Swiss-Prot record:
It comes from Danio rerio (Zebrafish). The keyword ATP-binding does not apply. GO terms for cellular component: cytoplasm. This is Protein CDV3 homolog. Residues 1-75, 92-111, 120-181, 209-236 are annotated as: Disordered. Keywords: Acetylation, Cytoplasm. Its main location: cytoplasm. InterPro entries: CDV3.
Amino acid sequence: MADVAPAGVEKSLDDFFAKRDKKKKKEKGKGKEQVTGAAAAAAMPVKKMKKEKEKSTKSENQDAQMEKEDEEWKEFEQKEVDYTGLRLQAMQMSDEKEEEEYEKEEVGEDGEIILVTSDKMSGPWNKSGGAPPSAASAPVEEVEVPEPKAPGVYRPPGARLTTTKKAPAQGPPEIFSDAQFPSLLSTARHVETRKDREMEKTFEVVKHKSRVREGEGPGSMQQLQLDNQYAILGDK
């Protein structure tokens, strides 16, 4: 009986530990299911957020492209610059001419002061059809100003007497002139001129191909002895 009791105790212990392990496994399974369910629930809004972000980025890109296309057709608007520090004013172009009149005091012949109104815009660049100047204005005296003399430059006596002569105006070149445009055929149709005659006095003009040298004329031909001078020696 003593041996049987410990065996029953061991079985009861094994059953106890087996039940405890089953409980632990069940608790672990429930915990995993809860974790997976929570993870899935957390993942759903993340996916929705990603989709919403993608949609928003696409819409922003489309809006940016539309704005760029609109900017190409926008008219240029000049920005107003503050010139107060530089003491300058912005120029404003207007179609109508704004002429401001001012009064000018002039002294007449009798010493009376005359007020003359004139336009600021008038001048040599903007002539307006106004009245001619009044005759009451005093005549302006012309003062002769002596012309300044050029500084003295030394010139040699020969250069002082020489005067610059204008060369005669040359006309167009004569194309058919042999003197200006000589050719090979000019000797065949050569016409004697006064200049050629003067040249003949100092130079000999060759006009023929065959030229007789000096000392080779017909009068200077030597008489040659053509007979045999040694014939006398043969008779002996």
